[in-house]
Amino acid sequence: MKIDPVELTKKLISFKSITPKDDGAIEHIAAILKKSGFECEILEFGDKVKNLYAKYINGVPNLCFAGHVDVVPPGELKDWISDPFKPEIRDGMLYGRGAADMKSGIAAFIAAIVDSVAGKFRFSGSISALITSAEESTEEHGTKAVLEWMKSKQKKIDFCIVGEPTSSEKLGDTIKIGRRGSATFKLICHGKQGHVAYPELADNPIYKMISILSKIKDTTFDTGNKYFQPSHCEITTIDVGNNTNNLIPSSIAAGFNIRYNNIQTLDGLYKLIDEICSSVTNDYKLSMQSSRNVFLSIPDRNTDIMLDAINKITGIDAVLSTNGGTSDAAFIKDICPVIEFGMINKTAHQVNECVSIDDIHKLTAIYKEFIKNYFYPTNKILNQINVIGNTPDGPLLA
């Protein structure tokens, strides 16, 4: 069975899978994989949020590809040059919501794994796919829930590739080997309401908040390290809720987010922010919520295999990066080593989201090359494994 990754991308775009709905995309992928001998489990969590775990069982190790079919809303339809859920090809580019993030990535790895299990070469090992419809929103019902289910069923993954759009300028220029953590803070400062003409009878909390936020913004959390940029804070909201211009408010709220590296800990960040607040006032309330923790996959043999695959197909020497936002790799790292690699991310979440047709084919070829060398290591690393024989299609592994 041969899958055209471009046609599959177009089909996936046609599903109006605005997060956390899949609109039939999960079932469509499962049907394709079942025809190729994969055992498929469609899992529903929460308010019928659908996920898929599919596995072609052929021993160990288990190489998994992961991704999400859900997309963010398209925004104003009038701003699109075509219907975001009716894929169109123009000048070698495929347009549609999810084209970059990340339906083309899913189509590429589905085409690659189907072709690999149906190919001429023999290999010892399993290939699986973990696909969710809840990456962009209700994360507790998506990949995180699937991994908990897998643990309960003693289903293991040895290595995972998340097909998120990691490339910046050209396909193959960036592999993500980790991600910064995200900690969101909410701060409320209290004061005493009063008339602006009698400030001595009131206590304006706005000045307290300004002082605290200034101190936080001026804080150097760290200077980064070999793998990570410095941790940094961005103030995202300030709200007084006061529409009266002669009234000193009784309270003020602010929100800010810290993207932190592996030098920091959540407890340490909270303690630092709390100390800054208490240095200004004792009348405040501070809370913190963490969505995804920082993680790092130390480069190893599998990273080298991906670097070689990218170079062979594109001629590009990829860089290893931890920049950018969070992803479900932050959950997967708790059960196995994980890297992220996929399409160019320039138009992700934007109006007129698009990807190159040529890049879809190249990404498929890169994934296929990785699969081949993951199970059939190249000569430079054959001495690291036990080879028990050779076939016309490559070494037969123990």
Swiss-Prot record:
Q: Which GO terms describe its molecular function?
A: acetylornithine deacetylase activity; cobalt ion binding; succinyl-diaminopimelate desuccinylase activity; zinc ion binding
Q: How is the cofactor bound?
A: Binds 2 Zn(2+) or Co(2+) ions per subunit.
Quote the InterPro entries the UniProt record gives.
Bact_exopeptidase_dim_dom, DapE_proteobac, Peptidase_M20, Peptidase_M20_dimer, Peptidase_M20A
What Enzyme Commission number(s) apply to this enzyme? Answer: 3.5.1.18
**Positions annotated to bind Zn(2+) 1:** 68, 101, 164
What is known about what this protein does?
Catalyzes the hydrolysis of N-succinyl-L,L-diaminopimelic acid (SDAP), forming succinate and LL-2,6-diaminopimelate (DAP), an intermediate involved in the bacterial biosynthesis of lysine and meso-diaminopimelic acid, an essential component of bacterial cell walls.
What name does the UniProt record give this protein?
Succinyl-diaminopimelate desuccinylase
Reaction(s) this enzyme catalyzes, per UniProt: N-succinyl-(2S,6S)-2,6-diaminopimelate + H2O = (2S,6S)-2,6-diaminopimelate + succinate
Asked if Repressor is a keyword of the record, the answer is no
Q: Which cofactor does it need?
A: Zn(2+); Co(2+)
Task: Provide this UniProt record's keywords sorted from A to Z.
Answer: Amino-acid biosynthesis, Cobalt, Diaminopimelate biosynthesis, Hydrolase, Lysine biosynthesis, Metal-binding, Zinc
The alphabetized list of GO BP terms reads: diaminopimelate biosynthetic process; L-arginine biosynthetic process; lysine biosynthetic process via diaminopimelate
Q: Which residues form the active site?
A: 70, 135
Q: Name one Pfam family in it.
A: M20_dimer
* Binding-site residues, Zn(2+) 2: 101, 136, 349
Q: What pathway does this protein act in? A: Amino-acid biosynthesis; L-lysine biosynthesis via DAP pathway; LL-2,6-diaminopimelate from (S)-tetrahydrodipicolinate (succinylase route): step 3/3
Instruction: Provide the assembly information.
Output: Homodimer.
Which NCBIfam families does the record cross-reference, listed alphabetically?
dapE_proteo, PRK13009.1
Q: Which organism is it from?
A: Wolbachia pipientis subsp. Culex pipiens (strain wPip)
Q: Where is the signal peptide?
A: none
Family of this protein: Belongs to the peptidase M20A family. DapE subfamily.
